[in-house]
Regions:
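Conserved HxN/HPN-centered segment at the entrance to the catalytic loop
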Residues: 39-50
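A conserved loop-to-beta-strand element in the N-lobe of protein kinase catalytic cores
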Residues: 54-63, 70-71
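Activation segment signature within eukaryotic-like protein kinase domains
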Residues: 89-90
């Protein structure tokens, strides 16, 4: 649609109100208004512009975005992303979830369909988190509440245990695994064994850093599962650390007298996460 006041293109979500969804719509609008205060552009969250009625239908206007990560994977014929593509996506998701966690909100519906590319041609892998229709305040979530798509559902949801913002982190881990392995699998050990052999020591170390982070996010215990802030400080996502480590390694490899050895003789999943 086109905003006649500004001339800009917007995306409009139209709710078909059958008399039973008015409360759901009201909750979604209230959630969107709360999230709108968080500086959506800075924090990688879709910009909610306004809500209005048209022909007795409730409409929500959002900024126009490109396509979802699911659409992108489908266009690629399900060829997995490489780590240099997964890294910025994960980093931006952590920023988004860190800020919504700060105001006590759980998204509850993370999946590749709800991660939108902003403009993939001009800003490759610049993403925004969308669809807060099922978002809840953590203080209002009761034990036994069923949430999240089944393939991305945290174990504490399935087991009927107390729920916190940690359920969203499980969802992020599932998305990371999906982007890297082409399909989501909870058996990471088997997935790693079937993954192509390392191409170089640099690639191998990066892969091990990614897998270590992924396993810590997919921690079965929500109390010890990494938080978004933990992940932002992780070497795999800490851009400055990653650049510095790679630069130092390249310099070492280029020295004429360099004698580089590796303790890793085959690709194996980290046996211990610290």
């Amino acid at each position: 649609c086109i905003n006649l006041t500004t001339g800009s293109h917007v995306a409009v979500k139209i709710h078909k109100d059958d008399g039973n969804v008015s409360e759901v719509i009201r909750k979604e609008i209230n959630m969107l208004k709360a999230i709108r205060t968080l500086d959506p552009d800075k924090n990688n969250i879709v910009n909610f512009m306004e809500d209005f009625m048209f022909n007795n239908l409730s409409c929500l206007a959002f900024e126009m975005l490109d396509r979802s990560l699911w659409d992108l994977m489908e266009e690629r014929r399900w060829i997995p992303l490489n780590l240099n593509e997964i890294r910025p996506v994960t980093h931006q998701l952590m920023i988004a979830f860190d800020v919504i966690k700060s105001i006590g909100i759980i998204h509850t519906d993370l999946k590749p369909d709800n991660i939108m590319l902003v403009n993939h041609n001009d800003q490759p892998f610049k993403i925004k988190l969308i669809d807060f229709g099922l978002a809840r305040r953590v203080s209002e979530v009761s034990i036994g509440t069923i949430m999240q798509p089944s393939s991305f559902r945290a174990p504490e949801v399935t087991l009927g245990l107390p729920l916190t913002e940690a359920v969203d982190m499980w969802g992020v881990g599932c998305v990371m695994a999906f982007l890297y392995f082409e399909e989501f699998t909870q058996d990471l050990q088997d997935a790693v064994k079937t993954y192509p052999a390392k191409k170089s020591d640099i690639e191998y170390r990066d892969r091990m850093a990614f897998l270590s982070l992924l396993m810590s996010i997919l921690d079965l215990n929500p109390e010890t599962r990494l938080t978004p802030r933990d992940c932002l400080n992780n070497p795999f996502l800490n851009i400055f650390n990653a650049v510095r480590q790679t630069f130092n390694l390249v310099l070492t490899l280029e020295l004429p007298t360099a004698n580089i050895t590796s303790n890793h003789h085959e690709d194996s999943f980290p046996s211990k996460i610290t």
